[in-house]
From Swiss-Prot:
Name this protein carries in UniProt: Dihydroxy-acid dehydratase
Enzyme Commission identifier(s): 4.2.1.9
Active site feature: S474 (proton acceptor)
UniProt cross-references to Pfam families, sorted A to Z: ILV_EDD_C, ILVD_EDD_N
Gene name per UniProt: ilvD
Free-text remark on how the cofactor is bound: Binds 1 [2Fe-2S] cluster per subunit. This cluster acts as a Lewis acid cofactor.
Positions bearing N6-carboxylysine: K127
Coiled coil: none
Cofactor: [2Fe-2S] cluster; Mg(2+)
Functional note: Functions in the biosynthesis of branched-chain amino acids. Catalyzes the dehydration of (2R,3R)-2,3-dihydroxy-3-methylpentanoate (2,3-dihydroxy-3-methylvalerate) into 2-oxo-3-methylpentanoate (2-oxo-3-methylvalerate) and of (2R)-2,3-dihydroxy-3-methylbutanoate (2,3-dihydroxyisovalerate) into 2-oxo-3-methylbutanoate (2-oxoisovalerate), the penultimate precursor to L-isoleucine and L-valine, respectively.
PROSITE patterns xref list: ILVD_EDD_1, ILVD_EDD_2
Catalytic activity: (2R)-2,3-dihydroxy-3-methylbutanoate = 3-methyl-2-oxobutanoate + H2O; (2R,3R)-2,3-dihydroxy-3-methylpentanoate = (S)-3-methyl-2-oxopentanoate + H2O
UniProtKB keywords: 2Fe-2S, Amino-acid biosynthesis, Branched-chain amino acid biosynthesis, Iron, Iron-sulfur, Lyase, Magnesium, Metal-binding
Length: 567
């Protein structure tokens, strides 16, 4: 490949009439020699407001060094982030999922607006990963995602703790099982430094999924944020994206149907977040890959849950790194026929070739259970259907002993009202707490319910009270919870007409989610109900008017997909 071929976009600056453009670029340090090399963007979601992202500006500098050492010209950019753990339980949570698509759009705008030939995207918090990947898939130029790494566990009285420990501490305090001082000690020790939340929560789930897809370097997702391996991974990403340019390797070569099947497989085996369904659907949509909720159930039925990771297990993601990391898990699954080993990745090698360089899981380790004795015989993410969710709903059942829950609904139109009911002991064992009008359009922004779910678990009701919503759950959530109910209430889905006292059934064996309300009664309620208007101001107003159903990934450009799958 010639240098001009590698400069498939930046060569636009070569002509005489682009002299003014080059004048601006010279002010940034470029010389005649630099104009002969590819321009590679390095874009991160660096921000000082959260440990997930506070270190990413320095990581951007490392990626630049990698790009430069490979003979290209690096240019660093920045985009936004919304910290879920800080926004949780506040009006700011409506901006979390919204930020995924803002990140995607801003990366595409910055990289396309400056005609870069390739780029490295660096992210840390939950929506950074899918936002970056949507942009990568839409642009289809050589690109690599590099994860900022997982946070180290906090330690209190010799025990590992994390952010979810604090959320659950609120429920224990309300139940009288913890003092305010106990909660304060959790608060002050849960987050010891930089990195994404430390269990198999959404950030680590999506970083893992991207590595499995083949769009991050092998090992990237499980390297702790403060490790030497992580720094090397970031710099290597800069070198690797230049190699992608040399090979003419594009995301569309990597993001195949088989890649998404493998990403779902590893997500099931590790017990990943429910948000993986939403984000993988959105990334697949951007990549023109046909993927649906039904695919998750198909894979769920054949892939066992192996990882004893938080939130339902006892280990954090750093523990997985110490016994071999995601590559060792993939190697184990590949050897047992669960993965497609012959597909290409961002290294230019196949999955099998990449994994050949890694060791097996450490003998005697306890983080990953053997296939012959799994934590659960099938996957923990289940797609439910029924007259309460005709287009589907997502349940995470890892650690849940109850197979079937039938109980009366207690219906709330906001999380705040539901939280108040929990705090005042209005929620009793057997209840089905329903929070609606918090979907993609209704929220707007489909906020997560970690504050609410953690309070229920903290009060000892995690297996005794079901929690249903057309909103989302944090990857840190566990218990009897069902989210992403579609159609959402704002779209006139059946959940909009559910009433307190109606009997609701959730069954993980039959994959049922239903309400004991006849079609005749449902039609009567529809006639009696006026749905609220869509939010209409600012970015949330824009989002509410264009976002798709959660069953389609809550994407903001669904209108332009024709039957052939072409955009």
């Amino acid at each position: 490949m010639t240098e001009l071929d590698k400069r498939h976009r930046s060569s636009i600056y070569d002509s005489m009439v682009k002299s003014p453009n080059r004048a601006m670029l010279r002010a940034t340090g470029m010389t005649d020699k630099d104009f002969e090399t590819p321009i590679v963007g390095v874009i991160s979601t660096w921000a000082e407001n959260t440990p997930c992202n506070i270190h990413l500006h320095d990581f951007g500098k490392l990626a630049k060094e990698g790009v430069k050492s490979a003979g290209a010209w690096p240019v660093q950019f920045g985009t936004i982030t919304v910290a879920d753990g800080i926004a949780m339980g506040t009006p700011g949570m409506r901006f979390s999922l919204t930020s995924r698509d803002i990140i995607a759009d801003s990366i595409e705008a910055a990289m396309s607006g400056h005609n870069v030939d390739a780029f490295v995207a660096i992210g840390g918090c939950d929506k950074n990963m899918p936002g970056s990947m949507i942009a990568i898939a839409n642009m289809d130029i050589p690109a690599i995602f590099a994860y900022g790494g997982t946070i180290a566990p906090g330690n209190l009285d010799g025990k590992d703790i994390d952010l979810v420990s604090v959320f659950e501490g609120i429920g224990k305090w309300n139940h009288g099982d913890m003092t305010a001082e106990d909660v304060k000690r959790l608060e002050c020790n849960a987050c010891p430094g930089p990195g994404g939340c430390g269990g198999m929560y959404t950030a680590n789930t999506m970083a893992t999924a991207i590595e499995v897809l083949g769009m991050s370097l092998p090992g990237s997702s499980s390297h702790p944020a403060e490790s030497a391996d992580k720094k090397e991974d970031i710099e290597a990403a800069g070198r690797a994206v230049v190699k992608m340019l040399e090979l003419g390797l594009k995301p569309s070569d990597i993001l195949t149907r088989e890649a998404f099947e493998d990403a779902i497989t590893v997500t099931m085996a590790l017990g990943g977040s429910t948000n993986a369904t939403l984000h993988l659907l959105a990334i697949a949509h951007a990549a023109n890959v046909d993927l649906s909720l039904e695919d998750f159930n198909t894979i769920q039925e054949r892939v066992p849950h192996l990882a004893d990771l938080k939130p339902s297990g006892q280990y954090v993601f750093q523990d997985l790194y110490e016994v071999g990391g995601v590559p060792a898990v993939m190697k184990y699954l590949l050897a047992n026929g669960f993965l497609h080993g012959d597909r290409i990745t961002c290294t230019g090698k196949t999955v099998a070739e990449n994994l050949a360089d890694f060791a097996d899981l450490t003998p005697g380790q306890k983080v990953i259970m053997p296939l012959e004795n799994p934590k659960r015989a099938d996957g923990p993410l289940i797609i439910l259907n029924g007259n309460l969710a005709p287009d589907g709903a997502v349940a995470k059942v890892s650690g849940v002993k109850v197979r079937r829950h039938v109980g009366p609904a207690k219906v709330f139109d906001s999380e705040e009202d539901a939280i108040q009911a929990v705090l005042t002991d209005e929620i009793v064992d057997g209840d089905v707490v329903v929070v609606r009008f918090v979907g993609p359009k209704g929220g707007p922004g489909m906020p997560e319910m970690l504050s609410l779910s953690s309070m229920i678990v903290g009060k000892g009701q995690g297996d005794k009270v079901a929690l249903l919503t057309d909103g989302r759950f944090s990857g840190g959530t566990y218990g009897l919870v069902v989210g992403h109910i579609a159609p959402e209430a704002q779209d006139g889905g059946p959940i909009a007409y559910l009433r307190t006292g109606d009997i609701v059934t959730v069954d993980q064996d039959t994959k049922e989610i239903s309400m004991a309300v006849s079609e005749e009664e449902l039609e009567k309620r529809k006639a009696e109900t006026t749905l609220p208007p869509l939010y209409s101001r600012g970015v949330l107003g824009k989002y509410a008017h264009i976002v798709s159903s959660a069953s389609r990934g809550a994407v903001t450009d669904f209108w332009n997909m024709d039957k052939s799958g072409k955009k």
